Amino acid sequence: MKFKAVYALLISSFILMLSVYILTSNTLYVQLVHLLLPSSIAAQSQPTLPSQSTSSLSSSSSSVSSLPDVFQKVENSVVQITSTKSNPNEVIILNGVPQTGRSTALGSGFVYDNQGHIVTNYHVVSGVKKADVTFTDGNTYSANVVGKDPNSDLGVLQITGDFSEEKVVSLPLANSSAVRPGEQVIAIGNPFGLSGTITTGIVSQKGRLLPNPDTGFSISDAIQTDAAINPGNSGGPLLNTKGEAIGMNTAIFSSTGIYSGVGFAVPSNTIAKEVPLLIKNGSYAHPWLGVSGGKISPDLIKAVGLPTNYKGVIIGSVQPGSPAEKAGLKGLTQDNDNGATHTGDIITAVDGHPVRQIDDIINYIESQKNVGDNIKLTVSRDGKLVELTATLQARPQTSSLSSSQNQDQLQPPGLGPIPELPQIPGFPPLPRLPPLLP
């Protein structure tokens, strides 16, 4: 009896210690992982080919009665994409001659129109000019990469050779602005090379800023979901229960590279806005303001003497030569003589729309503005409201950004410091702090 009592006490103590750790730990160890699958670990897959066509945002009110009906409706519009690129870090000996190695990876995509255009993620077709597209009936077609946008992680291919327009069924795009948290969603793709895999979940949240390690900028207005998506799902559709694409699965937060309940999709409105220009021009110019900043904290409100319910985005830094600098926006500064810190401007509204966090500004610019458009900024400066107008420029290349811009970043809400994690083979690592610069 005495041993049992001691044993029970030890178990109780362990549970108490674990509970305290869970309640007090505020660090979430995560890594942003693209969902591209190296073909060396892919299972054998037997993909099918489409049969209809439409593109652009759908406003259909007809509802599909069941998940099997949704899958049957769209399965012929979802494809597997196989891309092969040279690997300069690998040398193989073939017939006694050293040659650069090649790596092959698998991703997903879906039919955009009956002209044979396929949309997928940029990271699925990065570094290649051609790829193979396999439908669920097993038919494989060669396709040329006709457009890429690393900033939004979008890529467009076009099937070459003969194909039947009647059999290429485009997937209708829903209006992602109308999506609500809690809605049921369906993900279809080729996780681990298992073609035509369907998983379900809900919209966990919308309007997320998704850090993009390839560019240093963020993907705006991303949809968060708990539908299971894994390596190989990259570029596949996230669907509503009508069988319309509300987004494109692109990444997960995970410490292992495997699904852990938090996935992200590029919204369908971004696809609808960009893809026609990617087909036409091969690239897309993102509008850019050139600031970094963050939500006003209660401590700052108290220190500056603002009303307790004050809302807005405080500017941390302004990029030299940016539209923000030309418009006269001021960031956080420090007096070299006495070391005093001067608070930056506080943006309270853009084009008359109130803003509460940097996400609001970035999402508005990305969804509503184009390069060359003017944007009106309502700014609180030294206790007074001023109106400034900025003319948006094309977003610069990452390499041309100053180091201060790359470093002056904020963490995603609710996440503690992101530690350095070992890189998972085949997947890019997440920068320590995700960028929040429009």
Which residues does each PLM region occupy?
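Hydrophobic membrane-insertion alpha-helices, especially the h-region
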Residues: 9-22
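Conserved PDZ fold ligand-binding element
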Residues: 118-119, 324-359
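Serine-dependent protease modules
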Residues: 3-7, 24-311, 320, 358, ...
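A structural signal for beta-strand boundary/capping segments at domain termini and interdomain linkers
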Residues: 140, 385-387
